[in-house]
Amino acid sequence: FRACYRLWLSYRLAIFPIGVVMELYEVMRTTFAARDFVDELVSDEALARILDNARFAPSGGNRQGWKVIVVRDDATRARLGELIEPGFQRYAAQVQAGEAPWNTINASAVSDETVAATKLPRGFVDKLTGAPVVLLVFVDLSVVASFDSGLDRIGVISGGSIYPFAWNILLAARNEGLGGTLTTFVGAQEPVLQELLGVPSHYAFAAMIPMGKPVKQLTKLSRKPVSEFAVLERFDGAPLVD
């Protein structure tokens, strides 16, 4: 038994150094959308550890079509902020009108004039682009399966081959004492973003992840209970739990 334990321990420590291993459920329940960061560098070594573990996310056919661009350059950050603002402005205007923003089911009644007049929260965009490091995540559409491509609605299935990876990045960052948030505001300007970063047209933007050490680590998040979303056998079935 001792020999087996020593073998297991040596394997565990080879992957996760002492002092940085968190319990899985704790990581899942305390990884929050961090947007306020201390002025502290995120090293390339920390990023490499994060991505080295995030890469074990599943993807369709194990094709692993992700590409991550690490942005630190101030000029690029500034341009990202400019690209974020139009989409975020429309988002904010629709939220203020009580709508689900950028929704493909319920058409927006918010006019372009109202959108243009909507003021953005002070400093919000700067928090995203001014994080210690910004990751841009893209997915190669030439390798993902899109089983819903023929349906008369927005496609979502391709996301199954990229968002587990993006979420793994945030989970791994939490384990490193870091944090971030998955944002998609800049996606509305994808062609310009592709040109800015030299991204081929068949790579779709999936997420922008500002990352750093949070000013405050939240440990108690609010989410719906299981009884509100898990049912038995049918959409209108009985709750899985009371």
Regions found by a protein language model. Give the residues of each.
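Glycine-rich phosphate/pyrophosphate-binding beta-alpha loops
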Residues: F56-N62
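Small-aliphatic-rich amphipathic alpha-helix that forms the alpha element of a beta-alpha
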Residues: I50, A54, V133-L196
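Glycine/small-residue-rich phosphate/adenosyl-binding loop
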Residues: V70-I162
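Short acidic N-proximal helix/loop "leader" segments that mark the beginning
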Residues: I15, V20-E45, R49
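A glycine-rich helix N-cap at a beta->alpha junction
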Residues: Q89-N103, L197-K220
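Short, Lys/Arg-enriched N-terminal segments with co-localized hydrophobic residues
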Residues: F1-V21
